[in-house]
From Swiss-Prot:
BP GO annotations: transport of virus in host, cell to cell
Protein source organism: Maize stripe virus
Role played: Transports viral genome to neighboring plant cells directly through plasmosdesmata, without any budding. The movement protein allows efficient cell to cell propagation, by bypassing the host cell wall barrier.
GO molecular function, one term: RNA binding
Protein's name according to its UniProt entry: Movement protein
Amino acid sequence: MALMKLFSRSNGKVLVDDLSEEGQKRLDLANNKKKLLSARPLTKGRMSIDQAATVLGLEPFSFADIKVNKYDMFTAKQDYSIKANRVATFCIAVDPFWFHKPLTYYPFFRIATFAMVWIGVKGRAAGTTTLKIIDKSYVDPQDQVEVEVTYPICKNFAVLGSLPNFLALEDKTNLRVSVSIQGATVQNCVISRALWFWGIERTDLPVSMKTTDTVMFEFEPLEDFNVNHLSSFSKFTTNVVQKAVGGAFVTKSFPELDSQKEFGVVKQPKKIPIMKPKRSIFD
């Protein structure tokens, strides 16, 4: 009889852990974090630049929100790292699939406008970043288009520009980018991302280019986001490109071209005469 009472079911109160709701949330969050770290034992929680861009809200990007009717837009992205106090040189988006696409559909075109968004990951580093874009399609260095932009290393910035030259598929290795770091307070690598947005203007040969319209400018000093709050970067790329591409075709004056500024565009493209006048045989 005693054994029956001992093993019989009881209607008494069930004992539970008196953990509060907030404490339970903290426990669940800690457990989820441990699971994520254990799932990636090699990285120990470190993120690749693609993963970091996703966390920061920089990916994915779509041109669906960009209202541009006169131009066909092509996009590409490049990731690179550069040692502090060093110079890195690479070509602009030399991916053959990306570069070949506009040249396949539009045999004759020029780069009318492009936007470049430079995203620096080293938020607390001091020093300057100098970015040069050089078109080495010409044999004579005096004819090469060269643009130079200087900005603090820990800043994000966007640049719009226009090149007056025709491009061919063979020119894909002639658009060079040189990035240098000066006066940096770091010794390790500075990882960055460059997003290129090309505006393709379709033309027919022979057509003279309006070289007077060739200009490179920093369209807007971007806000100094707090890098400790990832939510601040929500739709960052979309907002930047929408302002850049949408406002570039209506803006007439560029106060950023003031040479007295410490940062910004410090060197403009040289005005290159595309169609030189023919000399008469009687001269």
